[in-house]
């Protein structure tokens, strides 16, 4: 064993190349679908899905993405709040952003036709006839004399004297609270708008008047109940309002001065989706139960479409009511035919992992966020597919999906674990509110020949037991691919494979054979193999590496690690325990060597690169171990997440480190600590793999980042910019408050440059060194001249400074 004195801590030094061999490719895989409901084209042949930076246009015949509409790239933080088809031109698509920008595109060719700007924040928008209704913040001058924080405007299209398109605003109403907006046309082609707050619905009806083109009458209905309203949907004069108890309040004619709502109640949880069909003859509803309910309004008869696989977030109905587009909680869209309630198309991206471990929006608590996940993703043996676990129904069901990065879609999915979700908690956004159990984490890996998959699911019967007594149940499952049914079939289930209440901390397939390895908190390493001539899997070898009976405290059990690896020929198995990495012979299970990483924290990951090198990562240290000479090749200190991947040749490997502001993908060679390539993330990386000849990073927003390799997006990623000729104001709408853009020097990226004074304290924080360490500011001035704290790191290219404390 090599002692700590033989370790030399390397500094972050960038290898100077003319070209970065691991540059980011133009790949648009993954991403989360926005909460904005899907939009049908007028001919009902296409559906529009909104993502973070673009709108995807999908064919309702093939389910393929045929085109993308990108948001302008010279404006930062564009958050869309509404995507609407023009009532006058079937090819014009309006995109309204929260910042007040309105972009009009020709969706047939993705051309940006014109842009307009509202000078205040927009919360919601909806078309009714030729009028565009928008809920905005009340202008500062008006809000000073009123407590109403929101204003509803009716915007009518027009043309200015200069010939540019504008929208002329008309004030409709003000209100202090706002939850949802919808609009519709009554039988006489007059507009109706419905706005709901937490306890009342506000209806604005457009009525004709001789001397004025528009006049509005307002009606309010107060719901005298403790439940809060959640959603609203209009169809002509009929209105449906839902509350957080799952009730639907139906008002048949809001034009009447007095009305008594009809109550429809089946859902036990708040409703997310409401939509009318067949001109008000049917009402569709859906929520956390994952069941679509179709209400026949005349008879109140109900029809159910269950087993959708995830909660329903929104519902959209085609213009001819022949199909329904359901946005599901697992980040997918399913279109259902109305005639037989069968699936027409299914657009499935990266299924989200509804877990308390992936809620962080930054890398500050990365290790804590990922601590509960054993290994939720892996790569198929042929290096083509990404295997991932995903949860739904607030952690009550966990599935394994096979994701094809070339098609950017899920090609296969099966349920790996389920805890009864017959009664989903109403406080579904709060994981600690679950008192009836949930699946905590799932590990997944596949055999070398790709015919078998092993999964580990860990679940608890009561959240209080998990938090106070750390009581968990574990199941090891082996699955075989059914070539006829094209799905995975359960072969063997082993409950508590490491003993009662013992948790499996690591799962790994052996490199060259169809065997699996597990490590558990009973301080044993177990090898599992398929019995000859049988469909049953069994433990064939056990290695005891510690005496857990003398370790009574839970604190000492944190020495168990997720680090587990095999050599390329399966002759050596490496596993982590405490601060040490142990290497044993896979046949005799005798110990070969031990590597100690002092002051590095808990071991997070390890991987053999080739026959000579093995990379070991702890929370605060990276070490390259030479297996042949049993010595340290090199090591360096930083804060690491534990994510690790190596190229197929073993000549390069990638890790993720982090600080309080960002994460970095750093690519090394096993021979030297010099950085081959470095890339910055403002999001939280949750998975790192090597596929299709490049390193693939999946972040907590389900965005896939690809570095090198042959993966490219099928759709051209041409970006749009707002220029001076296409920009106009919405008439005189709050013109005095319009923030003008500096069009002489447009922002070239999604972020502007923000410079700050570089201080010694900032350097200490940047490199994670003690605050009393001396820093020679003059000596490092030149290398730090481009690295002001707060500057977007991607602008540095491959230039990175090294801390000099001489």
Curated annotation (Swiss-Prot):
GO BP terms: namely:
maturation of SSU-rRNA; positive regulation of rRNA processing; positive regulation of transcription by RNA polymerase I
Q: Name one GO cellular component term.
A: nucleolus
Keywords of the record, alphabetical order, are: Nucleus, Repeat, Ribonucleoprotein, Ribosome biogenesis, rRNA processing, Transcription, WD repeat
Coiled coil residues, start to end:
none
Q: Does the keyword rRNA processing apply?
A: yes
Q: Name one GO molecular function term.
A: RNA binding
Give residue ranges of the WD repeats: 266-305, 448-489, 499-538, 598-635
Task: State what protein this is by name.
Answer: U3 small nucleolar RNA-associated protein 17
- Organism, scientific name: Schizosaccharomyces pombe (strain 972 / ATCC 24843)
Organism classification: Eukaryota, Fungi, Dikarya, Ascomycota, Taphrinomycotina
């Amino acid at each position: 064993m090599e002692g700590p004195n033989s370790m030399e801590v390397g500094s972050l030094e960038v290898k100077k190349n003319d070209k970065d061999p691991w540059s980011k490719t133009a790949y648009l895989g993954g991403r989360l679908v926005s909460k904005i409901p899907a939009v049908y084209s007028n001919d009902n042949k296409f559906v529009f899905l909104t993502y973070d930076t673009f709108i995807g246009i999908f064919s309702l015949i093939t389910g393929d993405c045929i085109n993308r509409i990108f948001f302008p790239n010279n404006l930062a933080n564009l958050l869309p709040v509404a995507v609407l088809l023009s009532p006058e031109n079937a090819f014009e698509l309006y995109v309204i952003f929260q910042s007040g920008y309105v972009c009009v595109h020709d969706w047939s060719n993705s051309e940006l036709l014109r842009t307009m700007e509202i000078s205040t924040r927009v919360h919601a928008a909806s078309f009714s006839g030729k009028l565009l209704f928008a809920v905005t913040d009340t202008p500062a001058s008006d809000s000073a004399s009123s407590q109403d924080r929101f204003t509803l405007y009716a915007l009518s299209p027009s043309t200015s004297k200069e010939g540019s398109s504008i929208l002329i605003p008309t004030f409709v109403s003000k209100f202090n609270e706002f939850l949802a907006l919808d609009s519709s046309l009554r039988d006489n082609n007059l507009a109706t708008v419905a706005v709901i707050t937490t306890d009342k619905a506000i209806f604005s009806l457009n009525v004709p008047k001789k001397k004025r083109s528009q006049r509005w009458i307002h009606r309010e209905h107060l719901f005298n109940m403790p439940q809060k309203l959640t959603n609203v949907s209009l169809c002509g004069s009929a209105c449906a309002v839902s509350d957080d108890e799952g009730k639907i309040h139906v008002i048949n004619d809001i034009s009447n001065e007095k009305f008594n709502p009809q109550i429809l109640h089946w859902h036990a949880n708040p409703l997310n989706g409401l939509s009318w069909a067949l001109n008000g003859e049917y009402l569709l509803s859906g929520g956390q139960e994952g069941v679509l309910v179709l209400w026949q309004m005349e008879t109140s008869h109900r029809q159910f479409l269950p087993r959708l696989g995830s909660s329903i977030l929104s519902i959209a109905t085609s213009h001819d009511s022949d199909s329904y587009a359901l946005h599901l909680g697992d980040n997918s869209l399913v279109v259902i035919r109305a005639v037989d309630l069968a699936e027409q198309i299914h657009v499935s991206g990266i299924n989200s992992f509804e877990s308390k471990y992936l809620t962080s929006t930054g890398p500050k608590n990365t290790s804590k966020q990922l601590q509960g996940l054993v290994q939720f993703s892996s790569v198929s043996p042929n290096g083509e597919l990404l295997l991932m676990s995903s949860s739904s129904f607030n952690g009550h069901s966990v599935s394994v999906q096979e994701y094809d990065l070339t098609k950017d879609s899920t090609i296969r999915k099966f349920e790996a674990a389920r805890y009864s979700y017959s009664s989903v908690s109403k406080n579904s956004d709060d994981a600690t509110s679950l008192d009836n159990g949930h699946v905590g984490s799932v590990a997944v890996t596949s055999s070398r020949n790709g015919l078998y998959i092993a999964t580990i699911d860990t679940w608890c019967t009561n959240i209080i037991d998990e938090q106070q007594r750390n009581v968990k149940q574990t199941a090891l499952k082996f699955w075989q691919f059914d070539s006829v049914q094209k799905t995975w079939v359960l072969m063997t289930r082993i409950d508590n494979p490491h003993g009662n209440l013992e948790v499996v901390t690591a799962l790994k397939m052996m490199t060259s054979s169809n065997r699996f390895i597990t490590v558990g908190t009973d301080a044993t390493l177990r090898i599992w193999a398929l019995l000859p001539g049988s469909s049953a899997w069994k433990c064939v070898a056990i290695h005891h590496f510690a005496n857990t009976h003398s370790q009574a405290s839970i604190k000492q059990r944190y020495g168990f690690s997720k680090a587990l690896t095999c050599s390329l020929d399966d002759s050596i198995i490496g596993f982590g325990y405490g601060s040490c990495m142990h290497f044993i012979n896979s046949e005799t299970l005798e110990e070969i060597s031990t590597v100690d990483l002092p002051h590095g924290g808990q071991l997070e990951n390890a991987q053999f690169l080739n026959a000579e090198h093995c990379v070991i990562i702890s929370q605060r240290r990276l070490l390259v171990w030479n297996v042949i000479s049993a010595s340290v090749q090199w090591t360096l200190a930083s804060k690491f997440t534990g994510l690790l991947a190596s190229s197929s040749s073993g000549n390069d490997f990638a890790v993720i480190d982090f600080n309080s502001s960002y994460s970095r993908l750093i690519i090394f060679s096993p021979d030297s600590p010099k950085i081959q390539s470095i890339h910055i993330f403002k999001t939280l990386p949750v998975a790192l793999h090597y596929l299709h000849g490049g390193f693939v990073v999946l972040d907590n927003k389900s965005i896939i980042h690809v570095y090198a390799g042959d993966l490219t997006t099928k759709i051209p990623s041409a970006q749009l910019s707002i220029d001076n000729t296409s920009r106009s104001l919405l008439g005189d709408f709050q013109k005095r408050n319009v923030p003008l853009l500096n069009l002489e020097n447009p922002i070239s990226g999604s972020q502007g440059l923000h410079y700050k004074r570089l201080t010694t304290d900032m350097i200490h924080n940047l490199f994670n060194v003690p605050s009393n360490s001396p820093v020679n500011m003059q000596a490092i001035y030149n290398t730090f001249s481009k690295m002001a704290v707060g500057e977007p790191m991607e602008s540095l290219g491959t230039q990175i400074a090294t801390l000099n404390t001489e």
